[in-house]
Amino acid sequence: MASEIHMSEPMCLIENTEAQLVINQEALRILSAITQPVVVVAIVGLYRTGKSYLMNKLAGKRTGFSLGSTVQSHTKGIWMWCVPHPKKAGQTLVLLDTEGLEDVEKGDNQNDCWIFALAVLLSSTFIYNSIGTINQQAMDQLHYVTELTDLIKSKSSPDQSGVDDSANFVGFFPTFVWTLRDFSLELEVNGKPVTSDEYLEHSLTLKKGADKKTKSFNEPRLCIRKFFPKRKCFIFDRPAQRKQLSKLETLREEELCGEFVEQVAEFTSYILSYSSVKTLCGGIIVNGPRLKSLVQTYVGAISNGSLPCMESAVLTLAQIENSAAVQKAITHYEEQMNQKIQMPTETLQELLDLHRPIESEAIEVFLKNSFKDVDQKFQTELGNLLVAKRDAFIKKNMDVSSARCSDLLEDIFGPLEEEVKLGTFSKPGGYYLFLQMRQELEKKYNQAPGKGLQAEAMLKNYFDSKADVVETLLQTDQSLTEAAKEVEEERTKAEAAEAANRELEKKQKEFELMMQQKEKSYQEHVKKLTEKMKDEQKQLLAEQENIIAAKLREQEKFLKEGFENESKKLIREIDTLKQNKSSGKCTIL
């Protein structure tokens, strides 16, 4: 995180006010300044279940997120606390604390669903906090997970394979952590001791049957198992005596239950050690500005009455970042060219030799800062802009050369022009005297350094502009016969034609040079794009293999438990994923 950004306390990120979700612009400004990858940990749960206490522990603070000491819940909307990651240098820990679900004071709990969905969408680790054991009441209270299919879309249009849109959730949903507070029972299943993770998995076991009651029992369990392949569970004893709970944040560790202290330490160690950086499809690492864009896109969709869509969010982010990547690349090109070029160059080749490596650097800058460049729209834009910038430097180089040559011609030939005006050459033999002086001055001009690639063209233009003067001196020189004058005229024409041919040949060579440069530039673009596409494809295949592996594990569990229908559904999803994998398609984009 930028050194000047230090959040000493949490700040509201998304305010839930009058049934409206409103983004806090100051919080967005803070996110904009965080250039590091972000690890986003969000917590949700019923009101007054101690969510904020755990988040303060993750921040390494005694206070911060409001705990409240009465039945009245404190946190409204989603609050954010960005702190340097205590265990991973170069990363920022973004903690998201949410308002209590099903708060009786709110009356209208419509936004509870959106708060839950946003916490899932924005986080890399999603913590669900509840009191007591995982029983049917706890599952019923977690009904929000069953509503995610109605609240979130992975794609903007239906999948042509016919697979349900929610099948893609596993590709971008966070790790699911269930924290059980005031857990007073022994961790046992069928009389045998189990770990907290095993307890969670046992609690997610389905019941056989097709009646309404069984379906209601199975639905939340199915959703958790299908949407969240990475699951973890932590249990916590009651932290202190009931009378002391109202001042929990002020209690010293020795005043707390010893087992609770150990359990909190285990929880914080796991979350801080294993929570991953927030990533998007294709391995796109999320930093502060990218998280800001996701917040704006998702809340904007909700405010407009539509569903937050992962595909739309990624493409919106790509549009913003790819446009910025083009500007970064062009800025790099201009800065480097301005620093390294010494105008005027003596040849076009000299300028192009400078241009090529800097153009290559600019392409690298773009590729490093871009992603999801559908149909190479932005790389094409970059290519066109680089051509325009190159041509602008070529023109400027020629203009500088022309201006320098013009000044030099005026300095060198100015005295000769004055002599012509004074009539110095308007006498017998004056013509040859004029030619002799002009040749000497021409030699002086040609020997002058730093004229650039317009030197010959400017000299030719200058001589052409004085052709009438030369013709007048020739015709008025009484010492020359008519025959001599004709010979001199032919010689002058021949010299002019030779100069014109040289200029034509030069332009032809420059044209060929530009065509060669165009081909080299095109090949450079293709090479770098191919390399990036290979890297992206490799990342995509790795992601899809992980998703397939997760679904296979769950499918095998369903089959082992005797739920053939659920097993077959997952097999269809896996087959579709394998087809997408072979065709190189992202599960989301």
UniProtKB/Swiss-Prot annotation:
Enzyme class: hydrolase
Compartments, record wording: Cytoplasmic vesicle membrane; Golgi apparatus membrane; Cytoplasm; Cytoplasm, Perinuclear region
Principal location listed in the UniProt entry: membrane
Topology of the protein relative to the lipid bilayer: Lipid-anchor
A Gene Ontology BP annotation from the UniProt entry: adhesion of symbiont to host
Residues recorded with modification Cysteine methyl ester: C586
Oligomeric form and interacting partners: Homodimer; homodimerization occurs upon GTP-binding and is required for the association with membranous structures. Heterodimer with other family members, including GBP1, GBP3, GBP4 and GBP5.
Single GO molecular function: GTP binding
Function: Interferon (IFN)-inducible GTPase that plays important roles in innate immunity against a diverse range of bacterial, viral and protozoan pathogens. Hydrolyzes GTP to GMP in 2 consecutive cleavage reactions, but the major reaction product is GDP. Following infection, recruited to the pathogen-containing vacuoles or vacuole-escaped bacteria and acts as a positive regulator of inflammasome assembly by promoting the release of inflammasome ligands from bacteria. Acts by promoting lysis of pathogen-containing vacuoles, releasing pathogens into the cytosol.
Post-translational modifications reported in the UniProt record: Isoprenylation is required for proper subcellular location.
EC number(s) stated in the UniProt entry for this protein: 3.6.5.-
Induction annotation: By IFNG/IFN-gamma and IFNB1/IFN-beta. Up-regulated upon infection by T.gondii or L.monocytogenes. By IRF1 in response to bacterial infection.
Domain of life, source organism: Eukaryota
Family: Belongs to the TRAFAC class dynamin-like GTPase superfamily. GB1/RHD3 GTPase family. GB1 subfamily.
Binding residues for GTP: G45, L46, Y47, R48, T49, G50, K51, S52, R181, D182, L245
Ranges where the GB1/RHD3-type G domain occurs: 35-276
CDD domains referenced in this protein's UniProt entry, alphabetically: GBP (cd01851), GBP_C (cd16269)
Record key words, sorted: Antimicrobial, Cytoplasm, Cytoplasmic vesicle, Golgi apparatus, GTP-binding, Hydrolase, Immunity, Innate immunity, Lipoprotein, Membrane, Methylation, Nucleotide-binding, Prenylation
InterPro entries, per the entry: G_GB1_RHD3_dom, GBP_C, Guanylate-bd/ATL_C, Guanylate-bd_C_sf, Guanylate-bd_N, P-loop_NTPase
Signal peptide: none
Lipidated residue numbers (S-geranylgeranyl cysteine): C586
Name of this protein: Guanylate-binding protein 2
Propiece residue ranges: 587-589
GO CC terms: cytoplasmic vesicle; cytoplasmic vesicle membrane; Golgi apparatus; Golgi membrane; perinuclear region of cytoplasm; symbiont cell surface; symbiont-containing vacuole membrane
